Amino acid sequence: MNLIISKGISYGWNVFTAKDYIEFLSDLKGYLNGKLIFINPEESRWKDAPQVSGDKRFGTYPVGVLSNGKNTIEIFFLHYHSEQEAREKWERRIKRINWDKLLVKFNDQNGCTETEVEHFMKLPFKNKLFFTCKEWPNLS
């Protein structure tokens, strides 16, 4: 999942499960204001999910947890080798968000179900895109 922030530049935000990504978007500012902590990958609540357990790289990259004060989500920092590097990139990118030019996108990967698609379609973002290669007959 990615957030495209401004000036046509796409910033990779690594990987969320579809469920956590929708939760993240549902309170974007709350989560972005939360403190990023790191956990041992074996402590991930998603470690047995097919999209995580099937990844041969699992356990070799940092896993972060964010809280908005009510709920927590996990972020898989696939492209970083250390917690320090992941934190530095995360904090730098948060500072660069242009809220006036925010575009959010979602796709049908990482455990996406019709429930997550329905929630995404209802999110109040002015600019959003959903990429899919499937038919979603129950969605209008």
Which role fits each region the language model picked out?
Residues 1-116, 126, 137:
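Positively charged, amphipathic N-terminal segments that serve as targeting/anchoring signals
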Residues 118-121:
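Histidine-anchored nucleotide/phosphate-binding helix
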Residues 128-130:
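Conserved beta-strand scaffold positions in the cores of enzyme catalytic domains, especially
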Residues 132-140:
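Polybasic, proline/glycine-rich intrinsically disordered low-complexity segments
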